[in-house]
Amino acid sequence: MSETSYLTDPRVMETVLRRLDELESREAITGLMVDYMAATDAKEDKGIKVARLFTEDGSWESVGPHGNPGWAATGHEALIKKFDRNVARMPFSAHFVTNPAIDLDGDVARGRFMYFQACTYRGDQPLWIAGSYDNDFRRVDGKWLISYMRVHNFFTTPFDQGWVKVPHMDTP
């Protein structure tokens, strides 16, 4: 097969387009999780910012030995309520997401991520929180959204001399 015919072969183009879609989908899903982290750290309109990242029927659930079934939420209205009540509980939070592992199957995907969070609980209690996400994603009208988020909390632990008592430490 000549180079010219190879480049114009529809099978080659189909393979290239499929691979491009996979790369773009992985990047979009990773970006979606970064957007989720930023939304959960928002001081205003937190619930709306989080809910818009989920499908209309999207669910959030806390699972595992440290899970809290009372925090489960399904649908935009429930997600907004759930995340808006976090503003008073945690007036400061900084979420970080790492280690994406994404499996794609057309317009659905499964993604696993690790997270770390520094936060202030109930006004003056500094905490470290870490865990993982095991999420289902669905592409709706060309946009990837979270359809089911499972949050597995590894630990929530006080940090005795955290950012509340020492807001900034010089590190020359």
Regions found by a protein language model. Give the residues of each.
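A solvent-exposed, acidic/Ser-Thr-rich amphipathic alpha-helical stretch
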Residues: 46-115
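A beta-strand edge to alpha-helix "cap/lid" segment located at domain peripheries
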Residues: 2-17, 88-172
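Short, low-complexity N-terminal intrinsically disordered segments enriched in polar/charged residues
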Residues: 1-42, 46-48, 52, 56
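Active-site micro-motifs of SAM-dependent methyltransferase domains
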Residues: 38, 60, 151
